[in-house]
């Protein structure tokens, strides 16, 4: 029984082509308008479970900041620095409204669903990724996740106020059992994912496998990190971009 967990799906287009490669798929999206689009797109897939909740460290209610570009919406209010920086591209990170959404503890939810192993864990929840992953400690410690593809923020950055999503936190949480393979930006496609072009001591490093990002000079403080369970075969996750 192969399982995909998809946290922060938005309209679900990032992974739609992968759903039929898994026996069960769990999709989480708090924005009610985006959730309605998910229902229309995936209602015919009986193996796909759609959940209209934000993944968090607790079950209940929380404020949710809806941005002009819905992909930037978050449980955290975008920081002034992030909003101003984003304006150089467009005004998509500007908050247009604040709503109340349901929240769940993801680790508890998946245990209640009797999920025994997650083949691919995909998380893009705008600053809450580390907080959510901490609820999965039982899965992590017992090596019950094969591959992880997670939005990550650079150390020292605060993109969403009050949310710590720094790379060093992921490294500490996953370090013993999981290997950091590479970081990517872009969209899902054929071939291996491309790493961010980074500078270390002024030199451009373009190798796909980068083991240490502590000295990265990354203009964009957001990227997506790919982690694999030690000894687990390379799978779909290694080809993903976001």
Task: Report the location of each language-model feature.
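Phosphate/nucleotide-binding beta-alpha loop and adjacent structural elements of enzyme active sites
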Residues: 1-242
